Amino acid sequence: MPQQNSYSKEDLVKAGTGELFGEGNSQLPSDNMLMMDRIITISEEGGENGKGFILAELDITPDLWFFDCHFKGDPVMPGCLGLDAMWQLVGFFLAWTGGPGKGRALGVGEVKFTGQILPTAKKVTFKIDFKRVIKRKLYMGLADGSVSVDGREIYTAKDLKVGLFTDTSKF
């Protein structure tokens, strides 16, 4: 598939089955663990550091799976799912730029939670700003990210790290 600057839910589902970037290359999680409904913009230029950025969204509805189990009587989206969404987007960016291999989260320097996502929310926006992209034997992305709900920033992450690996057997 030619490189696009935005992706629909249908495109992202294809990224979860290996159809978007080819067999053996980076895939997004499928089904419930796919944490975005669309990528609004993806670019190798621009962003806070001039090294590329992504803007993506997740529509919130009260029937999303995690609200039933986290927590009973006090439903809130787990913060770790927002963090995972940011890692998913860093990996997607690496594959989108032509990186071979399977994506693996390698860490994060700092995460701060200053709000929550409730079933009454409408939209979550993920913003990823790349600080560095290494394209050698190892493809690796280093980025800062944020999660906003209905226009209010509620999570930030510094130094999100994701790598692409052609062999994950010794990982």
From Swiss-Prot:
Homodimer. PANTHER family: 3-HYDROXYACYL-[ACYL-CARRIER-PROTEIN] DEHYDRATASE (PTHR30272), 3-HYDROXYDECANOYL-[ACYL-CARRIER-PROTEIN] DEHYDRATASE (PTHR30272:SF8). Its EC number is 4.2.1.59, 5.3.3.14. Pathway: Lipid metabolism; fatty acid biosynthesis. CDD domains: FabA (cd01287). It comes from the Bacteria. It catalyses: a (3R)-hydroxyacyl-[ACP] = a (2E)-enoyl-[ACP] + H2O; (3R)-hydroxydecanoyl-[ACP] = (2E)-decenoyl-[ACP] + H2O; (2E)-decenoyl-[ACP] = (3Z)-decenoyl-[ACP]. GO terms for biological process: unsaturated fatty acid biosynthetic process. Its main location: cytoplasm. HAMAP family: FabA. Keywords: Cytoplasm, Fatty acid biosynthesis, Fatty acid metabolism, Isomerase, Lipid biosynthesis, Lipid metabolism, Lyase. The active site is at H70. InterPro entries: FabA, FabA_FabZ, HotDog_dom_sf. Belongs to the thioester dehydratase family. FabA subfamily. One of its GO terms (molecular function) is trans-2-decenoyl-acyl-carrier-protein isomerase activity. One of its GO terms (cellular component) is cytoplasm. This is 3-hydroxydecanoyl-[acyl-carrier-protein] dehydratase. The keyword Iron does not apply. It is found in: Cytoplasm. The keyword Zinc does not apply.
